[in-house]
């Protein structure tokens, strides 16, 4: 065999240089949690020479801050508001995928025996909310619909866990939560819903986001991730009890509550388009109007990654 032929054989036998993709997720990142548990994403990425490390965050905003500073490459689903806050802070992001609207998967809760009967009754009340979360916009939208502004309440910016603790101990008058926290609290405490996002109030899409640099460099990996997320979303809807059993152990919530929470989510993963970002602009403008974002944000002025064949 010639030296050239031997060199070719050695080159073909040499394994691809391994690269790690750092994936951030939060408790409500259902599809990512399932993929982390079953190992299917690692298997699918292995032929590309890619390994995966997983990093959990309390909510979406810290996750995207980690992407912005280069600590994470890809962020599992975050609420629609989160990329807007990150964009306002100058983050270089790329939309990778979206989950179709799930308006009933977030809501404003009050204790079952609360004298608060409507959103209008929240005037002067203390409300727990996670800053920059989708529920933050739901609160703004619900207040506006009732003739109130954000300045008419006293916000308590808390993580989901701290928000729930404050809620059950009656340290706040209301709590704006999303699933699975929402359903779990409602079932355990009998909390009442003042408003969810239905009837056009807040669509509550969820987005998968990568750093713009990673999207430019590893579109092949994003294609694999996109396809696996779409497959897993379909599986969850087709197998609600099996999905609930897996997630119950991960979330520390009983399977019946998980199944109910999952029924509120679409888990319909698709490509992000400019027309599909129309509500993002409405959300951004609402936060600017309340002085919660310092300057106008053009929500289409961001990279949109497109899956192969879209």
Q: Model-found features: residue ranges?
A:
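Short, solvent-exposed loop/beta-turn-alpha elements that line the ligand-binding surface or hinge
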Residues: 42-50, 199, 268-276
């Amino acid at each position: 065999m010639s030296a050239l032929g031997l060199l070719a054989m050695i080159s073909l036998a040499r394994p691809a240089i391994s690269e790690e993709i750092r994936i951030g997720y939060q408790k409500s990142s259902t599809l990512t949690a399932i993929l982390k548990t079953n190992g299917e994403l690692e298997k699918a990425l292995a032929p590309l020479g890619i390994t995966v490390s997983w990093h959990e965050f309390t909510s979406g905003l810290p996750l995207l801050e980690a992407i912005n500073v280069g600590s994470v490459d890809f962020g599992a689903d975050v609420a629609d508001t989160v990329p807007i806050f990150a964009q306002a802070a100058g983050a270089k992001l790329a939309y990778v995928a979206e989950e179709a609207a799930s308006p009933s998967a977030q809501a404003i809760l009050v204790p079952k025996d609360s004298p608060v009967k409507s959103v209008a009754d929240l005037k002067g009340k203390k409300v727990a909310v996670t800053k920059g979360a989708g529920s933050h916009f739901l609160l703004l939208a619900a207040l506006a619909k009732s003739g109130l502004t954000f300045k008419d309440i006293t916000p308590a910016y808390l993580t989901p866990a701290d928000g729930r603790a404050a809620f059950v101990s009656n340290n706040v008058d209301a709590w704006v939560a999303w699933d699975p926290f929402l359903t779990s609290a409602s079932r355990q405490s009998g909390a009442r819903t003042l408003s969810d996002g239905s009837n056009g109030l807040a669509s509550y899409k969820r987005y998968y986001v990568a750093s713009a640099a990673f999207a430019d460099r590893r579109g092949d990996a994003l294609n694999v991730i996109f396809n696996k997320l779409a497959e897993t979303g379909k599986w969850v809807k087709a197998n609600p009890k099996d999905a609930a059993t897996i997630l119950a152990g991960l979330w520390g919530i009983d399977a019946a509550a998980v199944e109910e929470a999952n029924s509120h989510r679409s888990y319909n993963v698709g490509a992000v388009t400019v027309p599909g970002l129309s509500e993002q602009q409405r959300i951004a403008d609402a936060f600017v109007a309340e002085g919660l974002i310092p300057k106008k944000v053009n929500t289409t002025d961001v990279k949109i990654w497109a899956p192969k064949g879209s």
